[in-house]
């Protein structure tokens, strides 16, 4: 297990606005460092000296507009709640800090800026960030201490410098509403752009700095509508004139469930063209919006989704990843696309059996960099120029990493009882026993998609390595892409009666277990299941409802009690189906079916989990003990949901595999 878990994983890939400079972070068995490369040779250079598996994340990596500096945050867990709260996965007697650092690319000197978070760099080398909820500033070229820029009430988000770096747009959440402000200098009061009782977000400057586009959604709480009936969540695109502060609506979402708001991409391409993302046709796609006539043009039509969208520095091109290509199997892959915005011309930059993600343009050179993986090789940074692509840092693949022995997952599909087509990937090594034990893997999220190769997310690259290890041991593993996940359209992503409203997605997991049990090479009496987070919830649900099918399971930081998804009513007015909704949430929870849970289980949780509170597992274990039900458990003190310390991750991986092997093989 340790060998296959030695994969290095990149993150934070970024490029300078001009020139040929790229940078990224690399996690090498818990040792996280920043690498820098510059054209024409693009030879990677390590820029940081962090040599310990200490659980300290690197995030917010970015170049200064002049390309002379790199800025990043070290510490925290920015994939969970309380992102700026320190992580002490090593259980040190002095807590680590969440700090902003800068790197002078001319000298290589690494300097701490301040204990703070959320940096944003403006032209030419102006740095702002959040400290104590307020905005501070400094100049990267200066040795002077940072100072607070101004004070404002509320929670600050969406900080964006104007193109000339002289003004700052931001939003402030004040509970019932959010407003868009512009700061110029300490002598000028903050100007509020088209302030209203709505929630304004995602401010984006026009290229000429004369206007700001933003997204507007409803404010307040509104009436107590039924909780179990899906409702349209409207949103609008507005633009505010900087000179007057007045705004106007440019576009309003269709009044359909598909048209609902879900935090889409938004940017200016030209002074008259806005690019935005919408689910309105049933798939996550890009659209252009003309300011002059409000005409909307679809840029990426087809039955696939786009994500990880990046605009070029000159605003002439977009790039993104998508699950489409020449083969039906590309539905479970990612390839890179691009759009020439002058002609709205769509091009596909990559194809084949690999996984490519997180593309960035390299300045205005036409080159691009992105994550690249296969079914066997984990992600590295790739550089593409024209038809030629080269990999960077192949030397980081450990000599004992079992790349050549890893299997290629194969795509399968099956039907749930209600007729829904469900996709998955089978991991199986050739040979071995005539009848092999089977394991279902349930991913977390749930807004995730497992792929026919290494995932572009570090958490799921780890679970991919577990699936490979289980296949090596002789298991047949089926990774199920159940409903609520992405990649298969809106209705699959947002089904009725999901999660606490009925857990309709569980039937996909059960159908996967039955599909696996009925394979000719699988022993149907030896089926196990494991999963983390939402997958932990589904694991416990499987064991509680169907112990006759799922003979053993490993529940990693799962959710077990959904009753708390609805707050207790504090006013006279409550949803007409409030009591029914509470009952459905209870019945959707694993704890409601403990009487039929007979299969062995291993519970694993860390106690600084910011995504699923450790109390979810503590409460379930208490219930087990009160009912005198057997279980095994592992508590990881100090770590988070994302196993920030590699040693802890490997311990969890090995324990998962050992528990399944003990009950299904030994």
Regions found by a protein language model. Give the residues of each.
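Beta-strand-rich domains and repeat architectures in extracellular enzymes and scaffolds
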Residues: 2-32
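Residue-level detector of Asp-centered blade-edge/turn motifs that repeat once per structural unit
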Residues: 17-18, 65-66, 122-123, 163-164, ...
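Hydrophobic beta-strand positions that form the internal "hydrophobic ladder"
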Residues: 22, 67-70, 127, 168, ...
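A flexible loop/linker signature enriched in serine peptidases of the S9 family
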Residues: 25-35, 51-57, 73-101, 110-120, ...
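Short loop/turn segments that connect beta-strands within beta-propeller blades
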Residues: 38-42, 104-108, 140-143, 184-188, ...
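Surface-exposed loop and turn segments in beta-propeller and other repeat-based domains
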Residues: 49-53, 248-264, 395-409
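Serine-hydrolase catalytic core recognition
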Residues: 348, 357-666
């Amino acid at each position: 297990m340790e060998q296959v878990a030695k994969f290095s994983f990149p993150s934070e890939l970024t490029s300078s606005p001009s020139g040929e400079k790229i940078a990224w972070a690399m996690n090498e068995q818990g040792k996280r460092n920043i690498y820098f490369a510059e054209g024409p040779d693009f030879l990677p250079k390590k820029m940081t000296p962090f040599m310990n598996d200490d659980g300290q994340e690197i995030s917010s990596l970015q170049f200064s507009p002049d390309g002379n500096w790199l800025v990043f945050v070290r510490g925290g867990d920015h994939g969970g709640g309380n992102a700026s709260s320190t992580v002490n996965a090593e259980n040190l007697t002095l807590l680590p800090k969440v700090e902003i650092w800068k790197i002078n690319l001319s000298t290589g000197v690494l300097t701490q800026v301040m204990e703070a978070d959320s940096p944003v760099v403006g032209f030419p080398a102006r740095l702002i960030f959040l400290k104590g909820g307020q905005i501070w500033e400094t100049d990267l070229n200066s040795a002077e201490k940072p100072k607070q820029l101004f004070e404002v009430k509320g929670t600050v988000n969406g900080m964006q410098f104007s193109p000339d770096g002289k003004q700052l747009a931001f939003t402030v959440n004040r509970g019932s509403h959010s407003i868009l402000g512009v700061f110029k200098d300490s002598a000028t009061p903050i100007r509020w752009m088209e302030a209203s009782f709505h929630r304004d977000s995602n401010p984006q400057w026009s290229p000429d700095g004369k206007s700001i586009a933003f997204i507007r959604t409803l404010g307040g709480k509104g009436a107590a509508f039924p909780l179990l009936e899906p409702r349209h969540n409207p949103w609008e695109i507005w633009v505010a004139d900087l000179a007057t502060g007045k705004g106007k609506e440019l576009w309003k979402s269709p009044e359909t469930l598909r048209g609902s708001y879900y935090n889409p991409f938004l940017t200016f391409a030209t002074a008259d063209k806005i690019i935005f993302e919408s689910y309105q046709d049933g798939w996550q796609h890009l659209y252009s919006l003309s300011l002059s006539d409000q005409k909307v043009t679809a840029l990426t039509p087809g039955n696939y989704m786009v994500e990880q969208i990046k605009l070029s520095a000159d605003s002439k091109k977009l790039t993104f990843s998508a699950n489409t290509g020449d083969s039906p199997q590309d539905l479970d892959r990612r390839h890179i696309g691009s759009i020439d915005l002058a002609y709205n011309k769509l091009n596909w930059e990559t194809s084949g059996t690999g996984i490519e993600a997180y593309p960035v343009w390299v300045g205005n050179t036409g080159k691009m960099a992105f994550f690249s993986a296969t079914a066997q090789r984990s992600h590295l940074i790739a550089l593409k120029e024209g038809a030629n692509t080269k990999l960077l840092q192949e030397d980081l693949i450990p000599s004992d990493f079992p790349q050549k022995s890893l299997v290629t997952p194969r795509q399968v599909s099956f039907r749930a009882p209600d007729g829904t087509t469900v996709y998955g990937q089978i991991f199986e090594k050739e040979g071995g026993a005539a009848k092999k034990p089977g394991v279902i893997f349930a991913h977390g999220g749930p807004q995730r998609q497992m792929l026919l190769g290494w995932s572009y997310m570090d958490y799921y690259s780890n679970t991919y390595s577990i699936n490979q290890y289980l296949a090596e041991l002789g298991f047949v593993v089926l990774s199920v892409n159940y409903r609520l996940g992405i990649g298969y359209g809106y209705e699959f992503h947002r089904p009725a009666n999901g999660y606490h409203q009925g857990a309709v997605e569980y039937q996909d997991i059960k159908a996967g277990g039955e599909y696996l049990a009925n394979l000719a090479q699988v022993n149907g009496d030896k089926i196990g299941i494991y999963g983390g987070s939402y997958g932990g919830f589904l694991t416990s649900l499987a064991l509680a409802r169907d112990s006759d099918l799922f003979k053993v399971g490993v529940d990693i930081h799962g959710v077990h009690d959904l009753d708390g998804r609805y707050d207790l009513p504090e006013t006279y007015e409550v949803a007409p189906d409030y009591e029914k909704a509470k009952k459905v949430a209870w019945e959707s929870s694993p704890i409601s079916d403990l009487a039929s849970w007979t299969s062995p289980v291993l519970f694993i949780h860390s106690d600084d989990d910011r995504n699923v509170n450790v109390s979810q597992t503590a409460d379930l274990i208490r219930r087990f003990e009160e009912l005198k039900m057997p279980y095994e458990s592992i508590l990881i003190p100090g770590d988070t949901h994302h196993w920030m310390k590699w040693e802890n991750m490997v311990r969890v991986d090995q324990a998962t595999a050992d528990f399944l092997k003990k009950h299904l093989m030994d």
